[in-house]
UniProtKB/Swiss-Prot annotation:
Residues 119-132 have a biased composition (Acidic residues). It comes from Shewanella amazonensis (strain ATCC BAA-1098 / SB2B). Keywords: Cytoplasm. Residues 119-141 are annotated as: Disordered. One of its GO terms (molecular function) is enzyme binding. This is Regulator of ribonuclease activity B. Interacts with the C-terminal region of Rne. It is found in: Cytoplasm.
Amino acid sequence: MSIERLLKAQQEETRDIVQSLLDDGSDPDAEYMIEHHFSSTNFDRLEKAAVDAFKLGFEVTDAEELELDDGSVILCFDAIANHALDVDLIDKACEQLINLAAKQKVDYDGWGTYFMGDDEDFDDEDDDEDYDKDGFPIERH
């Protein structure tokens, strides 16, 4: 698929993701952690892509191995930016990162973020548990 077609498809997906989050009640004024996903079977190429993403101002996670359903293994990392859930900002980042991925011959696998809402909106079953100093639940009998 050409870069232009990838960009167009990504822009449509971005609008769908943002609208779904807002329709579900995610806070439109919150700062979101936007995680752009990259993968490759070639570590050297992936590392070059990570360096380039860092130079563009993104926080970059360490590369991790991921086993696919067919048993093959790929390497992946995320390029992270924190900002408003703004389609123009996300489109700009996607364009930069899709071009970067094409240059380094790695895969750009889209982006994701987390629902941002009032804490009261969540029913967390663990709210009543106490935790020890290491963060593990204390068992009650």
